[in-house]
Amino acid sequence: RNIRCLAIAGFFATGTTWGVTQWANLYMVKQLGVTAIYAGQVMSVFGTAALIAKPTIGILSDILPIKKNHLAALVMFLFAPALIVFASTSNPNMLFITGPILGIGAFMHSALTNALVVQSAAPHLRGTTAGFVNLFNQIGALLAPLLLGNVLVMTGSYQMSLMSIAIAPVIGACALFFIRLK
């Protein structure tokens, strides 16, 4: 059951992470009218925040008296409002605030879910289990940009495209509450 829940969480959260990462530049350039260089700078700050967030949440998960699956769920829940705030940003200067917040939300969960995969798998099946869960992560990463593109075609709005996928990490977070850790 734990592995199925992690696969579901990964499908939704990792799919959203890569869907957003692939579409954020277009949103900034096409919807907000910033230059590609400006959008690239915002995404560099997004990436830097994500880079710092992963080891930070790993350290916090070792220190805080909270189960890793609950902490991962909390982080996934926070990803949704971070995405909505980013997609609602109309002032390009604010992207340097909302971009890193989104970077943290988009990538922080994976450090915890990776640890949960190892913790949930039988020692002799850890590689197989990691491969299985990552298969669903990749399927999510494949389908999320397609979903965003379809919403864009239907609505003509990059903002609506990004907001449409904000529910996905919430679904992933809900799946994590069904994990039973020993």
Where are the regions a protein language model picked out?
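Intracellular juxtamembrane helix-capping segments at the cytosolic ends
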Residues: 108-121
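Helix-loop junctions at membrane interfaces in 12-TM secondary transporters
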Residues: 87-98
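A late C-terminal transmembrane helix in Major Facilitator Superfamily
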Residues: 118-157
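Structural signature of the two symmetry-related core transmembrane helices
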Residues: 69-84
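Multi-pass alpha-helical transporter architecture, strongest
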Residues: 87, 163-182
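Extracytoplasmic gate region of multi-pass secondary transporters
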Residues: 2-54
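Helix-to-loop junctions at the C-terminal end of transmembrane segments
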Residues: 54-66, 152-153
